Amino acid sequence: MALRRPMVAGNWKMNGSAALAQELFKKFAVKLQNDSAEVVLCPPTIYLESVRQLLEANKEALNGCLVRMGAQNLSQHDFGAYTGEISGQMLKDSGCRYVIVGHSERRRMYGETSDIVAEKFAAAQKHGLTPILCVGESGPAREARRTFEVIAEELDVVIEKNGTMAFDNAIIAYEPLWAVGTGKSATPEQAQEVHAFIRRRLSEVSPFIGENVRILYGGSVTPSNAADLFAQPDVDGGLIGGASLNSTEFLTLCSIAMSA
């Protein structure tokens, strides 16, 4: 069985501040005791430099603990007249290691199709970033028992453009749309069922990728439900929204992941 290092990725969305970053790093130095889990901070773009400086300044205090930086989005284009966009190379230059692609809010609010998501996935890897690919079904799709169908479609578009082996350098995040920002989380059994399906889907083409790819759960993860979610055999941590804005809650989630 593969040894997949758990990950806790905090997606601040359009929230947070430089002060929150400072508060988190003060607690990281005390609370993070080992490298058994990887912690990723995905602040708004304007705060990437603040987080980068804090990573550098606290390198010794972190004592080998794996704290990384990620972005919430990138353009599928390398450069050009795309006002307000940011390229993969720019994110790489800023110190990012990861970037979220295909988040449900971007798909829903900004019309990002699966084809665009596949292009962004490719752009991330082209510039040395590891994409965190989000997939998930809506409430009506779940009620219609179309969960696997929807997720297979979202995965297959990315696979068709990039190949299965591209997932050797990628993270997948299952985020049921009916749980994102609603306070209603999938049960551990529901999460495990979907994560196992994703792993099987990839294993059909590459058993190595299926066994080794990390799959996070995202959707109203809190300190009260994280232990049961993270204990599932195919759940490798969480993509955290609201709880990532509370330093105490976020550190608790990191500790749970480290002991999962």
Curated annotation (Swiss-Prot):
UniProt keyword annotation of Cell division present: no
Coiled coil segments of this chain: none
Record GO biological process: gluconeogenesis; glyceraldehyde-3-phosphate biosynthetic process; glycerol catabolic process; glycolytic process
SUPFAM superfamilies referenced in this protein's UniProt entry, alphabetically: Triosephosphate isomerase (TIM)
GO molecular function: triose-phosphate isomerase activity
GO cellular component, as recorded: cytosol
Residues at which substrate binds: 11-13, 181, 220, 241-242
Entries under InterPro entries matching the protein: Aldolase_TIM, TIM_sf, TrioseP_Isoase_bac/euk, Triosephosphate_isomerase, Triosephosphate_isomerase_AS
Catalytic activity field: D-glyceraldehyde 3-phosphate = dihydroxyacetone phosphate
Keywords, ordered alphabetically: Cytoplasm, Gluconeogenesis, Glycolysis, Isomerase
Function: Involved in the gluconeogenesis. Catalyzes stereospecifically the conversion of dihydroxyacetone phosphate (DHAP) to D-glyceraldehyde-3-phosphate (G3P).
Subunit description: Homodimer.
Official protein name in the record: Triosephosphate isomerase
Organism this protein belongs to: Shewanella amazonensis (strain ATCC BAA-1098 / SB2B)
